[in-house]
């Protein structure tokens, strides 16, 4: 089953489940839909005999090739602070949902029964550390 969304791409090749965070303009900051997609993917792969290990990376380059911006990026800058700010001001329950789901994801990764490899290229902060462990 494929749980891809625009910001999270997944594939299985050679026994490796590969997750690519694809939100480079926001340094791959995590949104609630991204966290939910990661949870669904890792839960499915946990019991999939075709997946022997999992690797996660960021699509971490922004800007056109050859420009200074093309060298800048990150694995994951953590949670989406714009969302946090707007949700807090609005009293949006999605803010609580984000942290509940993110900590569930972190717990799943910490106890994952298969090798889990994070390619931490560039900026890694907050929730980026959580999904790298």
Predicted regions and their residues:
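Hydrophobic core positions within the conserved protein kinase catalytic domain
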Residues: 42, 106-109
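Alpha-helix capping and helix-loop boundary segments enriched in small/acidic/polar residues
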Residues: 29, 89, 93, 120-123
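Conserved CoA-thioester-binding segment of acyl-CoA-metabolizing enzymes
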Residues: 1-57
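Hydrophobic/aromatic residues within transmembrane alpha-helices
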Residues: 19, 56, 80, 131-132
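Glycine- (often His-adjacent) and acidic-residue-rich active-site loop
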Residues: 58-104
């Amino acid at each position: 089953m494929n749980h891809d969304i625009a910001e999270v791409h997944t594939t299985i090749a050679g026994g490796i489940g590969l997750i690519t965070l694809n939100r480079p303009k926001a340094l791959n900051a995590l949104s609630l839909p991204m966290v939910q997609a990661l949870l669904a993917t890792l839960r499915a792969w946990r019991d999939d005999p075709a997946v022997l290990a999992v690797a996660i990376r960021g699509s971490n380059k922004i800007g056109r090739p050859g420009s200074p911006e093309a060298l800048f990026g990150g694995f994951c800058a953590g949670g989406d602070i714009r969302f946090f700010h707007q949700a807090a001001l609005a009293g949006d329950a999605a803010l609580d949902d984000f942290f509940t789901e993110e900590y569930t994801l972190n717990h799943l990764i910490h106890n994952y029964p298969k090798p889990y490899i994070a390619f931490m290229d560039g900026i890694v902060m907050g929730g980026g550390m959580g999904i790298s462990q």
